[in-house]
Amino acid sequence: MFSFIMKAAILLILVGCISFCISSEPLNESEITFEREERSLADPAGRQKRQSGLSCPKRISHSPEYPRDCYDILQSCSGQSPPSGQYYIQPDGGNLIKVYCDMETDEGGWTVFQRRIDGTINFYRSWSYYQTGFGNLNTEFWLGNDNIHYLTSQGDYELRVELNNTLGNHYYAKYNKFRIGDSFSEYLLVLGAYSGTAGDSLAYHNTMRFSTYDNDNDVYSINCASHSSYGRGAWWYKSCLLSNLNGQYYDYSGAPSIYWSYLPGDNDQIPFAEMKLRNRSI
């Protein structure tokens, strides 16, 4: 009798895991939710159900049962790969937030924190917007410097940058270490070694603080974040740049825009850019 009960319990767990990993749909909401969700102490199970039916056994044990990043979600179903899409996570020390998880590229588990795809979202924004995040997870967004800081402070993280040029050719840049500091450090950038096909246009900005048009932290005589010659947009400027993926969107006019200096082809007319991070445990 005991053996039968154990087998039935295992079967229920496997069915729940397969249901999440194969058939669940990404969350329906289109706008990023950066504000903290109120926790229901009386119904923690109900909160868990809101995470797209997540019922797989978890390797994480911290309260309140939300994964810390997309890598945690990937690891929650042994032998099965959850779909790419929107999920709730809660980084250590941070708020409950909704993110887009890339579960396909380079073995999956990537938490996407920036995307440029169609110019529908204005990226020429103030410090406070970049601090908390803005945009639409279905199109273009910045996840927020506070959120990126909390994510990259949880352990050893890597960065992957995806880029398309005007010919439609795809390139990537990967850094084996990625972290940004807190608001007191003005989100100082820390990078490791480069690999990839896009060229290393970010190492120049290593150890630089984040700048916006209303908070100039570069080492140049002008504010690089507000100057039209550099595409405008917030970034870890130095004096001034070899890259800026938050510049004004590519519009065929030839004006400075999203920029990656060593990208083959049109390095300052980039129609697609995406930045994502992942725990290096993979």
Curated annotation (Swiss-Prot):
Q: Span of the secretion signal? A: 1-24
Domain of life of the native organism: Eukaryota
Ordered alphabetically, the record's keywords are: Disulfide bond, Signal
> Could you tell me which cysteines form disulfide bridges?
C70-C101, C224-C240
Q: Which InterPro entries match?
A: Fibrinogen-like_C, Fibrinogen_a/b/g_C_1, Fibrinogen_a/b/g_C_dom, Fibrinogen_C-term_domain, Fibrinogen_CS
Pfam families reported for this sequence = Fibrinogen_C
Species name? Apostichopus parvimensis
Q: Does the keyword GTP-binding apply?
A: no
Annotated ranges, domain Fibrinogen C-terminal: 61-281
Signal recorded as keyword:
yes
Q: Which PROSITE patterns match?
A: FIBRINOGEN_C_1, FIBRINOGEN_C_2
Task: Give the protein's recorded name.
Answer: Fibrinogen-like protein A
Gene Ontology cellular-component annotations: extracellular space
